[in-house]
C-alpha cells in the first residue's frame, strides 16, 4: 500500500530530524521532481497556514542541510488558509530580500533601512531616499512578490514610499527591537551551547551498553519485498534490503548530532547507508550497530554528490537472525588439505578464521597445508590452543624426481650406426585412457638420413573438437574412414621392429602407444627409447626453452609444420642425431644404457615437472624434518617454485605422513592420463590417497582434460578402488582456499591480478570453500553412503589420530646464545667504568643502581645480550664510527657503563674527572645533567662534568626487570654491513640469520586489484562493494623480505630448524643472507634478535670528523652559540627573511622539519632538557597537538613542565609522591594510549597531581622513550656545533651524506636562481611531487649556505669526486652524482677512468666514463666540458 502525501511528508520530517515539530505535522508533499542530469530536486509542499518565520527557516535549513550534498534543493509552498498575512509578511521581509535572487548592493540597504508595513491589503515599504525608491522598480517588486508567493503567501502587492518625517523614528524603533531580538538569540545560543557541552560530557561517560536486538523505526517484515543490492541501479524513494554489516562508524557533527554510516553487503553487491540521530536513544542504538550484524534496512536510495555514488538514507533499521552454515553430521570429518592467506596470492582467509570455524562445527582436528610454505604455523598453533582443536602442521609441497630419465627400456646397444625410428602422435587430448590417437607418423633414420617413413590417420569414431582441430590442423574429413587404432598400431609395430625409438617428450607418446597396445591385447613397447627433450636439457642446461620449434631454430634444423606428426618426427630425428654426437664427444656416451648415468647432473631438479604432495608432521621430530625439507626447497632447490627432490624426502621422511594431494598430484594425473596400472605404481609412494569433490576438479573438464562428470566420477572411483587394492587409506579433502562459498570472489580478484602468468586464469576457478561434513558426504554420494562415510569421516579421522598430540612449531621460552664468562665480563666492564668515573668507593645511588640492574640482567640470563651489543659498539668505535642508541637501552646504567650507549640514566649530577667527587640532584631540580651550570669541584677545584638524564631502569626491562632486552643500535649506514658480518664472526655463519618478514597485500594494493578486476570484467561497482572486495583481498601473502636491521642468533647448542625453516628474501637466490622463513615477530620470544640499524647521523658525524679533525665526543653539550639556533638564525649571520625560517635548525636532525621548527618557534628552548622535551613531543601521538601546545599557549605550564617523554611520567609521579610501582603502571598504560588505569586517578589526586597533568595523560596515544630522545638530541647538538662554527665542513657533509636530490644548475647560478626554483616548488603546494618536496629541503639548505656568504661550483671534470662535495676556498665543488640522471656507479666509473688518464675529449669521456650523450650535452651547456674538444685529435708530432 502506497503512503499518503501527509505520510510521505512525515517520513521526510523524520529524515530531516523535525518529526517532533507540531507546527509542521499538517504538511504534505504534493510533488517531487528529480532532475537527474542537473542533480536538482524540486519539492512542492502544502500547509494549512503560513508557517511562522522561525519554523520556516528551520525547516528550510534542515531540508537543504540534509539533502544538499546529494542534489540542489528547490521548493515551493502553497497554503490553504492565507491568515495572518500582515504579521508574517513583515517578519519574512529580510528573508525575502536575501533569497529573492536580486543581485544589487542596495539589498543590504533594504534590509537595514526600509521598514515594511502591511496596510490596506498591500505591503508598504517606507524608504528614506529617492535612490532606494527608484531601485524598487516594477521588475524588482514583482520578483519580491513572487518570492513571497513561493513560501506560501498569496500574491502580494508591494508599494514603496518615501516618508521623511517618520523614517528615522521608525528606523530607530526597528533597530531597538532588532537589538532585543539579537540579544535573545545570543542568550538562546549560549543556553544551547551549555546544553551541548553538558550533553557531550554525559556522552563522554561510558554509555550504557545496548543489549538485545537493534530496532530503529518501524519493523521490516521478512515478507516485504527485499531487494538484492545488485538490482539497485538508480534512485528510489523507498526500498528494503537485507545484508551483513562489514563496516560501521559513528561521526559526531558540529551540531552535536551523530551520523551513523555503515556498509552492508548481501554478497551480490554492497551499499553505504546513513542515518542521523534524533536523540540520545538513537545514539545508544548507533553504538550497537557494528560490524558482524545482519540487518534489514528500509530507506531511500539517493545519489550522493560527494561520493558520486548511490547510497541509502535509512528510515528503519532492524537486526535479524542469519543462519550460518552448520555441520549437522553426527560424526565429523577432518580437513587435511587447507590453504590460508599464507599461500602466496592464492587463498584469502587467515588460519585463525579457518581453525575457529572447524572448532565451531565440532571438527576434532584440522590441517594447515599451504603451498610450499609453513608461515601460517605460529598463528595456527595459537589458534588451535585458543579453540581447543588439534592442529596438524603440513605443507603442499612441490615434489620432483632427482632427475628425469633420458633413456627408457635401457639396453647395452651402441648408439652409433644403428637404426632409429623417430615417431610422433597427434591426439584428441592428454589422457591416454580417455583420448585417442588420430595420427601416427614416424621416420626411420640411419646415420642421420631418412631411409623410410610411416604416416597414418586413425578414425577415433567421434567428431573432433574445435580445440583439437586448431591445435593439430587435422579435420574430421582427414580422419573419417581411416584405419582403426588396432590396425595402425599393428602396422607400426612391424615398422619399428628392432630399432631404437625416439621422441620429443616421448613419455607422452609412449604412454598413448602402450595404453593402446594393452587395450588391444598386445605387449607394450620393449625397444630402447630416447627422449630428446630430457637429452637436450642435460646437454644444454642454460637454454631458456626446450620446445621442439625452439630447439630446431637454435640448431638450424628445418621444421616445416609444427604440430603435424610427420614433420615433427623428422625434425626430432635430426636433432637426436646432433645431440647424440655431442653426448659422445662431451661425455663419452656410446651405449644406450649410459644415457641415464648423468641424469641427476646439471641441476636436473630444475627440469623435472613438480607434482603436488601433502606432507604432514606426525611427530615433533617430523616437524623438524619438515622444517629442513622446506628450507632445502627454498635455499638449495628453488627454481620458479620451491622444490623437494624425492630423494631428500626419503632421507627425512621419518615422522612425516605423505598424501597424494590434488589434480596436480601424480596419482590423480596418472589415473587421468595413463590409467590404473601407472597410477598404482605411483600410489605406493604415499601414506594416504586424496580425492576431492567434483566441483574442485571442474577446470579439468573446462580444459578438456576430462570429458565430463561421468569420467570424473570414474577417475575418483578408481582411486578409491586403488586404495583398497594397496591397503592405503583414501581421504576426501576439500583443497580449501577460502572459508565460505561467497568468498570465492576474493580469490578470483587475487588470481586476476596476476594475469596470464598464473595458469589458474585460463579457466573458471573451482569451488574450494571449507566444506562441512554434510556437504562433503553429499559431494561423494555417487560412491554410495558407506564408501562416502569411510573416505570423508573415518579415514580423515584415522590420519588425524595418527598424529601426535602437542606438536608445537614455536618454543615456549627464549633461547639465548652462550658466551662463556658473559656474566663476569659484563659485571667487570660495568664496575671498572663506574669506578673510573665515580671513584673507588661508589656513591650509594650508583652502587644501588648497578646492583639492581646486574641482579636483573645476570639473574634472567641477559648478560650475553649486553655483551654482544658491547662488542658490536666497541668494534664500531674502534673502527672510527660512533654508534647511537635507539629505544630504551639508554635507560640501563649497565648499558652506559659497559659502553653500549652514551646516555647516562642516573639523576642529574656533577662528577669530577680528576678526583671522582660527585653530587646528585634527586628531586627533579634539573631536567638534565647537561643543563647544570659550570662548577668547580669543591674537593680539588677541577671543573666538573654535568651528566645524567634521570631515566628509570624499569622503562627498559619492566618493573620486575625480567622483560627481554631489546637493544637497538644506530650504526652508520656505511658501517652497517660490517656490523652485520661481524655477527657471523662472533657466532658462525650457520647460527646467524636475517630476521624474515612477510609482505602482504596492503589496502591500496587490494583496491588496485579490485579496480583492475572491475575493468577486466567490464563491471561498474559501487564504492562500498569495491571496499568490501578490497578488504577480502588484503592480508594475503605477496612476497617475503628481511628486516632492515634484525639479526637473529641461534644458540650453538641448537640449530635454526629448532625455530624456523630458512629461505632467501623474496626468493632471491643471489641474496647475501638467508632469512628465517617465519616472520620474526612470531618467534621474537624464542630466539634472540639484535637490531643493528643503519642511520645517517653516525655517518654524518664521521664525515664531519674526517673533514675537520675534531673529535665529536669533545664537543660541549651546552654551547651557547649552538643553543641559539633553536630560537633564531641570527647566530648563523642571517635573518629569517633570508633563509625563510625563524630558526637556524634547517638540516639539523630531529629539529629541521617544518613541524618541529614550528614547535621551536612557539617554545624557544634554551637548554638540553627542553630539547629533550621537544624531541619527545614531536615523536609522540597526541602529546603536542591538542595537548602540551595548548597548555603552553594558555600559560598553564612551561615547556619544562609538560609531559614530553614516557619516562617523564614515572619520574614526575615519583616526585609528586606516588610509589614507584603505581607510577610505573600509570606510565605503561598512558604511553600505550590506554589512558590512566582504573583506580589510579584517585591515587594521583591524593598525591596532589594537578588536574592539567591528569587530563594530559588521558589524551596521549603514544609516547617516545626519553633515552631515545637523549641519544638523538646529543647527535643533533654535535652536528649543530659544526653548522655554527665550521659551516663549509657542515654543508659539505650534509650534501654528501643526507641529500639525494639536487638542482645543481640553480645552486651554482646563485641566490636569485635558487630562490626562483624554490618558489616554483612552493607554488605547487600539495601538487608538488615527492621528489620535488625532497629537493626543496635540499634547496633550503643550499639557500642558507649562499646567504652565509659561500657558493657552489658546477661539476669540475678534473676535480669533482664521484659522490662527495669538496671544499675549495669558500666554495663547494659538486660531485658527478649531482648531475641529473647520473647514477653513483657511472660517477665512480668517471673518476676511475680519470685516474687512469685525463680525458682527451667528449668522445673519450663518453666511451671511458660510460656517459650518455644526454649528460654530455648537459655538461656542455653548463660549461663543464669547455676545455674538451668533441672528438679525439690525432697529432702527427
Curated annotation (Swiss-Prot):
Q: What does this protein do?
A: Required for replicative DNA synthesis. This DNA polymerase also exhibits 3' to 5' exonuclease activity.
For this protein, the Enzyme Commission number is 2.7.7.7
One GO cellular component term of this record is: cytoplasm
Asked whether the UniProt record includes Signal among its keywords, one would answer no
Q: Which GO terms describe its molecular function?
A: 3'-5' exonuclease activity; DNA binding; DNA-directed DNA polymerase activity
Q: Does Transferase show up as a keyword for this record?
A: yes
**Annotated protein name in UniProt:** DNA polymerase III PolC-type
Q: What is its main location?
A: cytoplasm
The cellular location(s) given in this protein's UniProt record come to: Cytoplasm
Enumerate the catalysed reactions: DNA(n) + a 2'-deoxyribonucleoside 5'-triphosphate = DNA(n+1) + diphosphate
Q: Which residues form the Exonuclease domain?
A: 420-576
User: According to its UniProt record, which protein family does this protein belong to?
Assistant: Belongs to the DNA polymerase type-C family. PolC subfamily.
Its top-level enzyme class, in one word, is transferase
An annotated GO BP: DNA-templated DNA replication
Q: Which PANTHER family match?
A: DNA POLYMERASE III POLC-TYPE, DNA POLYMERASE III SUBUNIT ALPHA
Amino acid at each position: 500500500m502506497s503512503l499518503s502525501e501527509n505520510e510521505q511528508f512525515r517520513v521526510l520530517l523524520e529524515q530531516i530530524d523535525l518529526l517532533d515539530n507540531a507546527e509542521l505535522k499538517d504538511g504534505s508533499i504534493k510533488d517531487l521532481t528529480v532532475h537527474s542530469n542537473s542533480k536538482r530536486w524540486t519539492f512542492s509542499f502544502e500547509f494549512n497556514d503560513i508557517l511562522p518565520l522561525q519554523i520556516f527557516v528551520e525547516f528550510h535549513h534542515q531540508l537543504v542541510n540534509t539533502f544538499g550534498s546529494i542534489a540542489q534543493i528547490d521548493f515551493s509552498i502553497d497554503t490553504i488558509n492565507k491568515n495572518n498575512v500582515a504579521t508574517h509578511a513583515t517578519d519574512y521581509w529580510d528573508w525575502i530580500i536575501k533569497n529573492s535572487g536580486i543581485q544589487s548592493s542596495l539589498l543590504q540597504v533594504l534590509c537595514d533601512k526600509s521598514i515594511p508595513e502591511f496596510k490596506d491589503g498591500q505591503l508598504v515599504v517606507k524608504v528614506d531616499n529617492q535612490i532606494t525608491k527608484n531601485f524598487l522598480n516594477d521588475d524588482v517588486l514583482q520578483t519580491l512578490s513572487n518570492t513571497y508567493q513561493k513560501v506560501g503567501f498569496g500574491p502580494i502587492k508591494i508599494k514603496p514610499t518615501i516618508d521623511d518625517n517618520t523614517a528615522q523614528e521608525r528606523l530607530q524603533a526597528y533597530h531597538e527591537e532588532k537589538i532585543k531580538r539579537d540579544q535573545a538569540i545570543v542568550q538562546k545560543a549560549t543556553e544551547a551551547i551549555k546544553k551541548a557541552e553538558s550533553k557531550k560530557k554525559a556522552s563522554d561517560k561510558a554509555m550504557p551498553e545496548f543489549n538485545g536486538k537493534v530496532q530503529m523505526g518501524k519493523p521490516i517484515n521478512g515478507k516485504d519485498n527485499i531487494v538484492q543490492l545488485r538490482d539497485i541501479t538508480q534512485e528510489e524513494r523507498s526500498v528494503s534490503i537485507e545484508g551483513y554489516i562489514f563496516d560501521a562508524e559513528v561521526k559526531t557533527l558540529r551540531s552535536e548530532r551523530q551520523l551513523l554510516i555503515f556498509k552492508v553487503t548481501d554478497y551480490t553487491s554492497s551499499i553505504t547507508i546513513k542515518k542521523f540521530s534524533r536523540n540520545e536513544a538513537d545514539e545508544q542504538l548507533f553504538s550497537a550497530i557494528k560490524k558482524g550484524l545482519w540487518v534489514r534496512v528500509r530507506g531511500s536510495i539517493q545519489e550522493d554528490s560527494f561520493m558520486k555514488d548511490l547510497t541509502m538514507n535509512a528510515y528503519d533499521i532492524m537486526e535479524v537472525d542469519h543462519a550460518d552454515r552448520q555441520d549437522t553430521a553426527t560424526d565429523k570429518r577432518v580437513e587435511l588439505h587447507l590453504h590460508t592467506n599464507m599461500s602466496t596470492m592464492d587463498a584469502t582467509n587467515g588460519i585463525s578464521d579457518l581453525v575457529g570455524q572447524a572448532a565451531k562445527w565440532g571438527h576434532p582436528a584440522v590441517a594447515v597445508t599451504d603451498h610450499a610454505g609453513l608461515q601460517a604455523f605460529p598463528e595456527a598453533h595459537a589458534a588451535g590452543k585458543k579453540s581447543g582443536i588439534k592442529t596438524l602442521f603440513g605443507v603442499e609441497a612441490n615434489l620432483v624426481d632427482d632427475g628425469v630419465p633420458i633413456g627408457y627400456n635401457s639396453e647395452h646397444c651402441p648408439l652409433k650406426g644403428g637404426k632409429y625410428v623417430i615417431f610422433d602422435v597427434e591426439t584428441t587430448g592428454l589422457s591416454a585412457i580417455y583420448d585417442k590417437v588420430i595420427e601416427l607418423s614416424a621416420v626411420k633414420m640411419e646415420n642421420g638420413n631418412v631411409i623410410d617413413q610411416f604416416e597414418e590417420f586413425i578414425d577415433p569414431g567421434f567428431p573432433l573438437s574445435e580445440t583439437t582441430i586448431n591445435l593439430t590442423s587435422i579435420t574430421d574429413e582427414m580422419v573419417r574412414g581411416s584405419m582403426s587404432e588396432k590396425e595402425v598400431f599393428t602396422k607400426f609395430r612391424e615398422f619399428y621392429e628392432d630399432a631404437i625409438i625416439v621422441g620429443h617428450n616421448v613419455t607422452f607418446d609412449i604412454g598413448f602407444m602402450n595404453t593402446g597396445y594393452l587395450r588391444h591385447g598386445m605387449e607394450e613397447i620393449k625397444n630402447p627409447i630416447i627422449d630428446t627433450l630430457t637429452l637436450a636439457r642435460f646437454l644444454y642446461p642454460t637454454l631458456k626453452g626446450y620446445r621442439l620449434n625452439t630447439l630446431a631454430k637454435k640448431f638450424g634444423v628445418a621444421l616445416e609444420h609444427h604440430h603435424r606428426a610427420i614433420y615433427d618426427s623428422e625434425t626430432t630425428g635430426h636433432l637426436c642425431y646432433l645431440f647424440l654426437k655431442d653426448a659422445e664427444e662431451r661425455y663419452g656416451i656410446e651405449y644406450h644404457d649410459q644415457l641415464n648415468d648423468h641424469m641427476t647432473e646439471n641441476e636436473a631438479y630444475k627440469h623435472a615437472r613438480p607434482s603436488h604432495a601433502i606432507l604432514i608432521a606426525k611427530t615433533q621430530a617430523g616437524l623438524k624434518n619438515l622444517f629442513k625439507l622446506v628450507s632445502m626447497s627454498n635455499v638449495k632447490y628453488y627454481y620458479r617454485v620451491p622444490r623437494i627432490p624425492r630423494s631428500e624426502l626419503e632421507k627425512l621422511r621419518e615422522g612425516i605422513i605423505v598424501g597424494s594431494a590434488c589434480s596436480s598430484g601424480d596419482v590423480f594425473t596418472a589415473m587421468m592420463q595413463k590409467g590404473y596400472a601407472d597410477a598404482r605404481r605411483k600410489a605406493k609412494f604415499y601414506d594416504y590417497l586424496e580425492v576431492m569433490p567434483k566441483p574442485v576438479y571442474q577446470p579439468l573438464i573446462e580444459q578438456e582434460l576430462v570429458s565430463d562428470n561421468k569420467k570424473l566420477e570414474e577417475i575418483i572411483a578408481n582411486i578409491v578402488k586403488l586404495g583398497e587394492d594397496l591397503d592405503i587409506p583414501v581421504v576426501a579433502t576439500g583443497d580449501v582456499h577460502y572459508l565460505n562459498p561467497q568468498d570465492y570472489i576474493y580469490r578470483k580478484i587475487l588470481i586476476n591480478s596476476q594475469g596470464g602468468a598464473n595458469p589458474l586464469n585460463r579457466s573458471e576457478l573451482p569451488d574450494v570453500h571449507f566444506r562441512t561434513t554434510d556437504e562433503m558426504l553429499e559431494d561423494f554420494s555417487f560412491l554410495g553412503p558407506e564408501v562416502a562415510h569411510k573416505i570423508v569421516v573415518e579415514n580423515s579421522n584415522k590420519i588425524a589420530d595418527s598424529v601426535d598430540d602437542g606438536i608445537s612449531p614455536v618454543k615456549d621460552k627464549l633461547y639465548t646464545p652462550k658466551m662463556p664468562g658473559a656474566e663476569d665480563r659484563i659485571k667487570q666492564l660495568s664496575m671498572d667504568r663506574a669506578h673510573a668515573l665515580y671513584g673507588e668507593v661508589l656513591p650509594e645511588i650508583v652502587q644501588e643502581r648497578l646492583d639492581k640492574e646486574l641482579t636483573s640482567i645476570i639473574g634472567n640470563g641477559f648478560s650475553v645480550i649486553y655483551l654482544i651489543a658491547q662488542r658490536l659498539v666497541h668494534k664500531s668505535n674502534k673502527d672510527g664510527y660512533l654508534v647511537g642508541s635507539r629505544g630504551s637501552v639508554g635507560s640501563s646504567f649497565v648499558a652506559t657503563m659497559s659502553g653500549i650507549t652514551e646516555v647516562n640514566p642516573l639523576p642529574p649530577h656533577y662528577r669530577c674527572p680528576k678526583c671522582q667527587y660527585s653530587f646528585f640532584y634527586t628531586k627533579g631540580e634539573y631536567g638534565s645533567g647537561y643543563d647544570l651550570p659550570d662548577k668547580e669541584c669543591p674537593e680539588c677545584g677541577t671543573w666538573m662534568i654535568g651528566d645524567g638524564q634521570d631515566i628509570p631502569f624499569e622503562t627498559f626491562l619492566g618493573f620486575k626487570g625480567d622483560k627481554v632486552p631489546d637493544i637497538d643500535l644506530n650504526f652508520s649506514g656505511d658501517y652497517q654491513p660490517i656490523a652485520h658480518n661481524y655477527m657471523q664472526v662472533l657466532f658462525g655463519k650457520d647460527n646467524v640469520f636475517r630476521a624474515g618478514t612477510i609482505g602482504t597485500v596492503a589496502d591500496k594494493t587490494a583496491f588496485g586489484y579490485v579496480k583492475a578486476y572491475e575493468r577486466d570484467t567490464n563491471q561498474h561497482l559501487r564504492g562500498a562493494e569495491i571496499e568490501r572486495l578490497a578488504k577480502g583481498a588484503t592480508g594475503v601473502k605477496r612476497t617475503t623480505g628481511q628486516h632492515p636491521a634484525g639479526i637473529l642468533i641461534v644458540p650453538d647448542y641448537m640449530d635454526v630448524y629448532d625455530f624456523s625453516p630458512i629461505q632467501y628474501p623474496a626468493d632471491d637466490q643471489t641474496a647475501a643472507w638467508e632469512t628465517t622463513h617465519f616472520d620474526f615477530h612470531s618467534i621474537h620470544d624464542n630466539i634472540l634478535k639484535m637490531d643493528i640499524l643503519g642511520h645517517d647521523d653516525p655517518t654524518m658525524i664521521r664525515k664531519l670528523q674526517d673533514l675537520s679533525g675534531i673529535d665529536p665526543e669533545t664537543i660541549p653539550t651546552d654551547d651557547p652559540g649552538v643553543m641559539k639556533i633553536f630560537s633564531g638564525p641570527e647566530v648563523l649571520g642571517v635573518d629569517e627573511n633570508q633563509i625563510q625560517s625563524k630558526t637556524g635548525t634547517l638540516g639539523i636532525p630531529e629539529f629541521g622539519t617544518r613541524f618541529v621548527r614550528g614547535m621551536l618557534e612557539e617554545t624557544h628552548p634554551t637548554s638540553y632538557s627542553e630539547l629533550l622535551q621537544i624531541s619527545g613531543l614531536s615523536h609522540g601521538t597526541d602529546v603536542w597537538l591538542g595537548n602540551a601546545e595548548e597548555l603552553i599557549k594558555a600559560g598553564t605550564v612551561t615547556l619544562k613542565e609538560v609531559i614530553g617523554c614516557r619516562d617523564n611520567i614515572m619520574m614526575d609521579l615519583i616526585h609528586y609522591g606516588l610509589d614507584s610501582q603505581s607510577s610505573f603502571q600509570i606510565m605503561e598504560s598512558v604511553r600505550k594510549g590506554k589512558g590512566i588505569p582504573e583506580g589510579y586517578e584517585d591515587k594521583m589526586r591524593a598525591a596532589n597531581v594537578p588536574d592539567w597533568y591528569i587530563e594530559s595523560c588521558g589524551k596521549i596515544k603514544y609516547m617516545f622513550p626519553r633515552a631515545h630522545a637523549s641519544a638523538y638530541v646529543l647527535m643533533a647538538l654535535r652536528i649543530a656545533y659544526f653548522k655554527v662554527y665550521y659551516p663549509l665542513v657542515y654543508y659539505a657533509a650534509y650534501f654528501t651524506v643526507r641529500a639525494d636530490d639536487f638542482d645543481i644548475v640553480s645552486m651554482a647560478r646563485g641566490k636569485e636562481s635558487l630562490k626562483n626554483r624554490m618558489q616554483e616548488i612552493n607554488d605547487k603546494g600539495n601538487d608538488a611531487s615527492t621528489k620535488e618536496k625532497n629537493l626543496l629541503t635540499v634547496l633550503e639548505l643550499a639557500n642558507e649556505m649562499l646567504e652565509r656568504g659561500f657558493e657552489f661550483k658546477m661539476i669540475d671534470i678534473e676535480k669533482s669526486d664521484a659522490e662527495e662535495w669538496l671544499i675549495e676556498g669558500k666554495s663547494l665543488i659538486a660531485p658527478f652524482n649531482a648531475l641529473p640522471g647520473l647514477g653513483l656507479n657511472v660517477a665512480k666509473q668517471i673518476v676511475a677512468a680519470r685516474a687512469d688518464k685525463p680525458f682527451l675529449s667528449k668522445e673519450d669521456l663518453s666511451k671511458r666514463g660510460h656517459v650518455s650523450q644526454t649528460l654530455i650535452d648537459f655538461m656542455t651547456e653548463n660549461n663543464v666540458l669547455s676545455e674538451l674538444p668533441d672528438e679525439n685529435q690525432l697529432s702527427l708530432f
